[in-house]
């Protein structure tokens, strides 16, 4: 067939209704591309938010507003708060940590004093057993934990101590099907001296504990500050990550183009790992309309 004949045929098809055939071909191509994305492991992002960033917004109002723009979860709640989100048809993707006291009267379970000290283990084991049991009763499956600060302790000893205590907790977590998730935090800006401040350290702790019920919370904001290389790190350690948090760098504010991270690209990378959990917005809004900033964050992460 000559080029002239081929061109004339295309023009004839368009004039006589062939345009619909061309459109059908385009749709078919789109469907094929979507199928390729699905085959590569792409899954929808499940959206959550950390309640503490919206202290001046009631939990009821946060659920009502958030559900309208795609939030499925409000997290870092204690068990007695969770029925509120469930009433709205939402969930709590990550239950907050228990805080308790040792026999010596030291408050433990928070960021600074936790699993890297042997003397904290007895109190923490009792508190986490209760928290895990309550989490299971609510139909949930993820509880946050922390390493604690170094306070003069070297990283190797701290890891051994964390592993010793958390190994004792794993039979309880495994029995109830609840994952204990340790957060990676930066020790440069926000949490000076925090021990679990590198992904590789957390991943080695996961290997040492050796249970599918112990994982990491990869906080994108915190790890950008500590080590950068976010997408490559997510790809490398994807099997040891059970949860993600967001935040703009620098400042921990909105995740829009006022900060340096490319969140749509990061979300696409998370999708390609086949991750089926939640990504929680954990930035502190600077704008007067806090919920508008939250809505924007959800939209940015919907890829």
Q: Predicted regions span which residues?
A:
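N-terminal small/glycine-rich loop or linker at the start of catalytic domains
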Residues: 40-50, 98-114, 149-150
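Histidine-acidic metal/acid-base catalytic patches
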Residues: 2-67, 75, 138-141, 196-218, ...
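Active-site-adjacent beta->alpha loops and helix N-cap segments on the catalytic face
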Residues: 82-85
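Active-site acidic/histidine proton-transfer and metal-coordination neighborhood
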Residues: 16-29, 112-215, 225
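Feature marks short, surface-exposed loop/turn motifs that line or immediately flank catalytic pockets
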Residues: 53, 80, 98-102, 149-151, ...
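A short beta-strand-loop structural module common to alpha/beta enzyme folds
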Residues: 72-78
């Amino acid at each position: 067939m000559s080029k002239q004949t081929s061109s004339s045929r295309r023009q004839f098809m368009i004039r006589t209704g062939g345009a619909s055939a061309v459109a059908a071909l385009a749709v078919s191509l789109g469907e094929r591309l979507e199928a390729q994305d699905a085959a590569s492991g792409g899954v929808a992002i499940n959206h959550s938010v950390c309640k503490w960033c919206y202290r001046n917004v009631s939990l009821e109002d946060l659920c009502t507003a958030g559900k309208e723009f795609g939030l499925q979860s409000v997290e870092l709640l204690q068990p007695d708060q969770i029925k509120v989100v469930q009433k709205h048809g939402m969930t709590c993707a990550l239950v907050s940590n228990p805080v308790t006291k040792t026999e010596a009267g030291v408050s433990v379970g928070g960021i600074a004093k936790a699993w890297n000290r042997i003397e904290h283990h007895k109190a923490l084991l009792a508190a986490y057993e209760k928290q895990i049991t309550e989490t299971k009763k609510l139909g949930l499956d993820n509880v946050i934990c922390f390493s604690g600060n170094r306070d003069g302790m070297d990283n190797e000893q701290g890891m051994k101590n964390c592993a010793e205590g958390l190994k004792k907790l794993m039979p309880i977590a495994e029995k109830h099907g609840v994952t204990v998730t340790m957060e990676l935090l930066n020790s440069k800006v926000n949490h000076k001296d925090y021990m679990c401040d590198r992904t590789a350290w957390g991943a080695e702790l996961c290997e040492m504990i050796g249970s599918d019920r112990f994982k990491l919370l990869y906080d994108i904001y915190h790890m950008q500050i500590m080590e950068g290389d976010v997408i490559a790190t997510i790809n490398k350690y994807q099997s040891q990550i059970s949860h993600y948090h967001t935040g703009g760098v620098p400042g921990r504010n909105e995740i829009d183009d006022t900060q340096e991270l490319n969140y749509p690209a990061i979300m696409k990378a998370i999708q390609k790992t086949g991750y089926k959990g939640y990504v929680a917005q954990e930035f502190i809004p600077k704008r007067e309309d806090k919920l508008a900033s939250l809505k924007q964050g959800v939209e940015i992460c919907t890829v």
